[in-house]
Regions:
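A contiguous binding-surface segment within folded domains or other stable secondary-structure elements
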Residues: 111-142
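C-terminal peripheral helix-coil segments that are non-catalytic and often amphipathic
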Residues: 135-147, 163-215
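Helical hydrophobic small-molecule/effector-binding pocket
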Residues: 90-115, 170-172
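Membrane-interface starts of transmembrane alpha-helices
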Residues: 145, 149-157
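Helix-turn-helix
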Residues: 15, 23, 30-57, 61
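Short, basic, alpha-helical segments at the C-terminal edge of helix-turn-helix-like DNA-binding modules
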Residues: 64-70
């Protein structure tokens, strides 16, 4: 790590991650190089190696940042005092993930590459953040569905988080994939990230619908 203030180090890391995120909006993971990322920063390409050893580490840091933003949304959701029905909860959860398309894309398409080519310390930092995301979802469930047992919350998490790995490819197929489905005569439903998440969460929480209060 280069000498300098912690603030400068963090600012440069953020600039590198920002450049990576911008490129990922229009280019594929395998097509992006550290040279491409460096061309979008205010310092030399070789300086990037002071902060990240591989491009996969940069992408892993981007994925970690996306999870941190999601956690912030989940924590805000849990703090609200208004009760939520399963329908309301499902819609709120779907909204938080609709804003995290980059997160869903990275973890569904490039996770093994990122983790395999990153140093253990970087991977551990990401896994800690991933664990915090699971805890944040659990807190939301405990807040709005107090009747759920610890086992039921755990079962929701172990169904929900694996489900998230398939959301992006299903919601955002490539043009080539669409054409192949059409040529194969397979009907492809058009569903958004929000729609997919909402339907899944609602189905999982239907059993915990509170009965209407007696008059």
């Amino acid at each position: 790590m280069p000498k300098g203030s912690e603030a400068l180090t963090n600012a440069r890391k953020e600039e590198i991650i920002d450049a990576c995120a911008a490129l990922y909006e229009t280019m594929g993971f395998r097509d992006i190089t550290i040279r491409d990322i460096g061309a979008r920063t205010s310092f030399t390409r070789t300086s990037i190696y002071n902060y990240f050893q591989t491009k996969e580490e940069i992408f892993l840091a981007l994925l970690q940042r996306e999870h941190e933003a999601w956690i912030a949304d989940l924590e805000e959701m849990a703090r609200q005092e208004t009760a939520l029905t399963p329908e309301g909860f499902a819609d709120r959860m779907a909204c938080t993930l609709e804003r995290r398309a980059c997160m869903l894309k990275l973890e569904s398409m490039n996770l093994y590459d990122m983790e395999g080519s990153s140093r253990m310390e970087n991977l551990v930092a990401f896994k800690r953040t991933y664990g915090r995301a699971m805890e944040a979802v659990a807190r939301c469930l405990e807040t709005f569905f107090p009747a759920m047992t610890e086992q039921e919350v755990r079962e929701f998490l172990y169904a929900f988080f694996p489900f998230l790995f398939g959301v992006y490819p299903y919601a955002v197929p490539t043009e080539k994939q669409r054409r192949a489905m059409a040529l194969a005569g397979v009907e492809a439903a058009r569903c958004s990230i929000r729609q997919l998440v909402r339907v899944f969460v609602l189905k999982m929480l239907r059993p915990f619908q509170q009965p209407p209060a007696e008059s």
